[in-house]
């Protein structure tokens, strides 16, 4: 079993969504997501950001995670929701007939170890001019402390948005970024 998948299968058992809702809404506003946009929530965990995406788009939102336990938790958190579609998938292997306007990675990006593969897959499933939003609800410094002690097969140290965006330059332009004491954000636009 993939080490990341195994880690999150175990972590899901005690995982609680306790993010700052006002920060989530701010990040979504900054991302530019609007009504009728098709959004894929990648590495959704138990779905902390998914209902807020739906509040903006008013179209069903698909959310994927590599962990079956996380997806089960998301379905428990949002029962009987036809608007929030939670499915277990490895993003690198994800295939869909739908092309998305936005891919959002919220609190998940450090666990995607192959950024070049991430960039290629994002290019494949985004519409022309689609956007890749990479965000974390804590600063890069806090994230580094949070992930201290994690195996490098599970998480990686992320650089500044400028440094990280270089891996995406074949397919994307860095449109907007933030790296402050509150949150981390990269918005990349597909060329």
Mark where each language-model region is.
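Conserved class I S-adenosyl-L-methionine
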Residues: 1-32, 36-43, 133-156
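A short SAM/SAH-binding and catalytic strip from SAM-dependent methyltransferases
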Residues: 102-114
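Short alpha-helix
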Residues: 156-171
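Class I SAM-dependent methyltransferase SAM/SAH-binding core
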Residues: 46-92
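A short acidic, Gly/Pro-enriched loop at the edge of an enzyme's catalytic core
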Residues: 95-102
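A short glycine-rich, Lys/Arg-flanked "PGG" loop and its adjoining helix->strand segment in the class I
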Residues: 117-128
């Amino acid at each position: 079993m993939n080490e990341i998948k195994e880690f999150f299968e175990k972590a899901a058992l005690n995982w609680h969504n306790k993010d700052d809702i006002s920060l989530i809404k701010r990040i979504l506003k900054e991302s530019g997501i609007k009504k009728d946009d098709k959004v894929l929530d990648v590495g959704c965990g138990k779905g902390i950001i998914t209902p807020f995406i739906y509040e903006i788009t008013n179209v069903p939102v698909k959310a994927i995670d590599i962990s079956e336990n996380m997806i089960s938790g998301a379905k428990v958190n949002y029962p009987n929701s036809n608007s929030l579609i939670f499915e277990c998938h490895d993003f690198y292997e994800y295939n869909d007939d739908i092309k998305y306007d936005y891919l959002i990675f919220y609190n998940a990006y450090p666990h995607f170890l192959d950024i070049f593969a991430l960039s290629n897959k994002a290019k494949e499933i985004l519409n022309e001019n689609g956007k890749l939003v990479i965000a974390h609800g804590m600063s890069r410094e806090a994230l580094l402390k949070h992930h201290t002690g994690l195996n490098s097969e599970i998480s990686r140290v992320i650089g500044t948005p400028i440094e990280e965006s270089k891996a995406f330059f074949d397919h994307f332009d860095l449109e907007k970024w933030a790296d402050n004491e509150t949150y981390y954000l990269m918005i990349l636009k597909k060329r």
